[in-house]
């Protein structure tokens, strides 16, 4: 009896051990719609680093920002295209953002102080208005903001704006020229331009020689055509000289430009080539004396003269006369001769000494001197 009792207790102990080793069932519930069904884990997620796209090195530099806006017919403003075509007679209003705006426009408008053009500076923008436009107004209109540090100002290259405006008119294909015959100087060390600009960007333009009569091809090597400038001679030489004209065709119509005389310049660019010569280096009292300062230069380069003379401190009265003319030296070579003459009447002892002439052009200046003695 005891044996059976012990055996029963042993079996009951093993049964209770098996029940204790089992995991109790989980209290499951239905997941709601949209609930994440991915089981959470204890793994640490690596932080995602956003990829940075490579940029061109040029992007790191400040880009030029167009500050120009054009007034439209509907009263709104928009950035103008690089080239704009308008009918002659239309008005133009351009605005450029900035408190200190400067403008550039066709020189034709500035030369004659044209009242049709108005430039104003408002608090936040500059304004340019052109009314009753003509084909002669065709050209580049640009603006830029001026940066100033005290009295020193410079142009802000990052804030500019520009547009080239064609003012078209029926039967007028070329921008009018102030004369019927223009001179273009050919310098061997810089480009030369035959300025036959058109009023319509769609016009086909060709260059022609008057004699012998033939078309001069714009081959892109020696000569190129730029509708904003005209025909550009990239490397002028003496063979290019002669009389030429342009021919434009558009809309089934053609037109001939004014004629251009191409003259080759033999004098190299640089400071004035200057000489000085006195009518006499020994002068008696009471006689008159003249000192001549001469410059040989390029036909289209102006020269300014300045004199220093012995009687200047004593306010000695003198006469100074400046002149210039073109001289032809054969084979079509042309030179500009500029002269300045200082004349002293009734020579006195205070007039004896050094006569110094300084000639200046855009490329520099040259000073020469000669002495005049009292005899």
Swiss-Prot record:
Compositional bias per record (Basic residues), positions renumbered to this chain: 40-50
Name of a matching Pfam family: Ig_3
Intrachain disulfide bonds: 96-143, 293-357
Glycan-bearing residues: 219
Region (Disordered): 19-63
Primary site of residence: secreted
Ig-like C2-type domain span: 62-159, 272-375
Disulfide bond keyword on record: yes
GO cellular component, one term: extracellular region
Domain of life, per lineage: Eukaryota
Keywords from the named record: Disulfide bond, Glycoprotein, Immunoglobulin domain, Repeat, Secreted, Signal
Signal peptide: 1-17
Subunit field text: Forms a complex composed of PDGFRL, TNK2 and GRB2.
The name this protein goes by in its record: Platelet-derived growth factor receptor-like protein
Gene that encodes the chain: Pdgfrl
């Amino acid at each position: 009896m005891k044996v059976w009792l012990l055996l029963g207790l042993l079996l009951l102990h093993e049964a209770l051990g098996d029940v204790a080793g089992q995991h109790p069932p989980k209290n499951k519930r239905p997941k709601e719609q949209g609930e994440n069904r991915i089981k959470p884990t204890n793994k640490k997620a690596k932080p995602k680093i956003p990829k940075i796209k490579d940029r061109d090195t040029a992007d790191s530099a400040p880009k030029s920002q167009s500050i120009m806006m054009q007034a439209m017919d509907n009263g709104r403003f928009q950035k103008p295209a690089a080239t704009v075509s308008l009918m002659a007679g239309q008005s133009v209003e351009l605005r450029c953002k900035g408190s200190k705006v400067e403008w550039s426009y066709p020189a034709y408008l500035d030369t004659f102080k044209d009242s049709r053009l108005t430039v104003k500076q408002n608090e936040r923008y500059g304004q340019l208005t052109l009314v009753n436009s003509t084909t002669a107004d065709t050209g580049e209109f640009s603006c830029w903001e001026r940066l100033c540090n005290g009295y020193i100002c410079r142009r802000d290259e990052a804030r500019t704006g520009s547009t080239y405006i064609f003012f078209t008119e029926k039967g007028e294909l070329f921008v009018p020229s102030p004369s019927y015959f223009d001179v273009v100087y050919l310098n061997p060390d810089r480009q030369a331009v035959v300025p036959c600009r058109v009023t319509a960007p769609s016009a086909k333009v060709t260059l022609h020689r008057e004699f012998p009569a033939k078309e001069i091809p714009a081959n892109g090597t020696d000569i190129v055509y730029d509708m904003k400038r005209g025909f550009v001679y990239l490397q002028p030489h003496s063979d290019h000289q002669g009389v030429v004209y342009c021919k434009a065709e558009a809309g089934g119509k053609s037109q001939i430009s004014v004629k251009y005389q191409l003259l080759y310049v033999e004098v190299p660019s640089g400071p004035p080539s200057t000489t000085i010569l006195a009518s006499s280096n020994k002068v008696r009292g009471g006689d008159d004396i003249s000192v001549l300062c001469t410059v040989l230069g390029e036909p289209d380069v102006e020269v300014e003269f300045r004199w220093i003379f012995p009687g200047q401190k004593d306010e000695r009265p003198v006469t100074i006369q400046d002149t210039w003319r073109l001289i032809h030296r054969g084979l079509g070579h042309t030179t500009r001769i500029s002269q300045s003459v200082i004349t002293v009447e009734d020579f006195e002892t205070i007039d004896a000494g050094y006569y110094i002439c300084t000639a200046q052009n855009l490329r520099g200046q040259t000073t020469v001197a000669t002495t005049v003695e009292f005899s």
